[in-house]
């Protein structure tokens, strides 16, 4: 019952601040940054750090990265258990490829869905907790990288290290169009197979093998 009441309070709070949330999303989306544009990434990262500070009051730690895809980390709450929230601030499309516009209550533009909408959701989750005086009872740690769209080569080790002591990890990708929450995702595994024997054609000369 207590959890249900808290959920209702949080939802009511977010509904009340919907216009501000959309403005924050618009601000972040209009600060475009494809993975390959390091200068643009720096600008959107600066905007992201500013939003986190203004909305949550929390300071960010910005990692150094050789190629400029610097991850941003901040945390909120206390507790023995940690929940890790993962997101990214880079986008696929080159600057200017997609235009920002609204259609009814829908927002369109580069990164609205993938995944600046998720970043804003994470930030406003913390703001709701703080403004409503609700203790999450856990440490909430957030890590947003800038090279996800090309495979997270520079940030994988950082994310894996932060995940080691996490009770759970949640990726801040928005839900599907009907509101369903994604609870699983396909992965990628690479194998190197070394075979010792006698080469032969499996279809035409398999008897020549071993």
What do these predicted regions represent?
Residues 66, 87-89, 145-147, 172-175, ...:
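Fold-independent oxyanion-binding glycine-rich loops
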Residues 1-5:
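N-terminal amphipathic/basic-hydrophobic helices that include classical n-h-c signal peptides
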Residues 202-210:
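Acidic-enriched catalytic cores of C-N bond-cleaving enzymes acting on peptides and small amides
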Residues 106-121, 201:
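Glycine/serine-rich anion-binding loops at beta->alpha junctions
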Residues 84, 107, 167-171, 190-192:
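Short glycine-aspartate micro-motif
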Residues 7-112, 131, 136:
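Acidic/His- and Gly-rich active-site-bordering loop/insert found
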Residues 32, 85-88, 122, 142, ...:
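Buried hydrophobic positions in well-ordered alpha/beta secondary-structure cores of metabolic enzymes
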Residues 116, 120-186:
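Acidic/histidine-rich catalytic neighborhood of metal-dependent amide-processing enzymes
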